[in-house]
Amino acid sequence: MSLLHVHHVGHRYRTGGLLRKRGWLQVLDGIDLQLHAGESIGLLGSSGSGKSTLARLLLGLEKPAQGQVSFAGQDVSQLKGEQARAFQRTVQLVFQDAPGAFNPQRSIGWSIAEPLRHLTDMDEAARQARTLALLEEMGLRAEHAQRLPQQLSGGQLQRANIARALAASPQLVVLDEALSNLDRLLQLQILQQLEALRQRSGTAFVLISHDLSLVQYFCQRVVLLHGGRIVEERPVTHDLCFAHPVGRQLQAAVLPVRPQRRPSPQGLPTAAH
């Protein structure tokens, strides 16, 4: 049985207002998708393709207008009480906006431990040990736990944001453009750390991005969204080639995953840039 099953899901939003005619905007239509435990898939598409809306449906933040999202065989929209609490512990979302995920008046350590206070029975000592271990796992130091969000760089804050998502040992983590504001080297470092976690613990990942190079670096399978529909799905291989025009456009715009050396005017290699 798949860990996550999206069955013929559609979603729409109200449009219009006081001075405009009301109507509906269909943002997702006929989405079918499965994810297995320990798998990493990429949701690839340009802005407005429906990626972030699908992420919200996967985590039960919104109920689909049509179809069903099931996690471990249970309809996500029907979970209540202890079942809902268990689901919140099992599935985590990381947004692009790291500053918005933290209370500016609370320390980084306090924020990372927040899911542990609400979703687990850990005592204070265990929470502190888990927080420090997560910081180290994400390439941060123990002293960062005492700092306020505004005292960290953007890259450090996003790593702390991911550490917070991993705190309660979820089975699934959805990264919604979570690496978009980071430089390429830091993106790769974080993905290497998450890949090690995936292999070690069997955590599944959904990487939502418009950057094909990151999807190719991290994911086992790629799903291409366009106009609210899945238009192509392929395993990630070194010779990945899309048939759909949107996929080919994204492929043409791809940046190299690693910095490339270029020849100097004298034909000698120069340092990577």
UniProtKB/Swiss-Prot annotation:
Amino acids binding ATP: 45-52
Keywords: ATP-binding, Cell inner membrane, Cell membrane, Ion transport, Membrane, Nickel, Nickel transport, Nucleotide-binding, Translocase, Transport
InterPro entries for this protein: AAA+_ATPase (IPR003593), ABC_transp_ATP-bind (IPR050319), ABC_transporter-like_ATP-bd (IPR003439), ABC_transporter-like_CS (IPR017871), Nickel_NikE (IPR014137), P-loop_NTPase (IPR027417)
GO CC terms in record: plasma membrane
Family as reported in the entry's similarity comment: Belongs to the ABC transporter superfamily. Nickel importer (TC 3.A.1.5.3) family.
Membrane topology per record: Peripheral membrane protein
EC number: 7.2.2.11
Domain ABC transporter: 13-252
Catalytic activity: Ni(2+)(out) + ATP + H2O = Ni(2+)(in) + ADP + phosphate + H(+)
A family per Pfam: ABC_tran
Name listed for the protein in its UniProt record: Nickel import ATP-binding protein NikE
Subunit field text: The complex is composed of two ATP-binding proteins (NikD and NikE), two transmembrane proteins (NikB and NikC) and a solute-binding protein (NikA).
Origin superkingdom: Bacteria
Predominant cellular place of this UniProt entry's protein: membrane
General function of this protein: Part of the ABC transporter complex NikABCDE involved in nickel import. Responsible for energy coupling to the transport system.
PANTHER family to which the protein is assigned, alphabetical: D,D-DIPEPTIDE TRANSPORT ATP-BINDING PROTEIN DDPF-RELATED (PTHR43776:SF7), TRANSPORT ATP-BINDING PROTEIN (PTHR43776)
GO molecular function term, any single one: ATP hydrolysis activity
Cellular localization per UniProt: Cell inner membrane
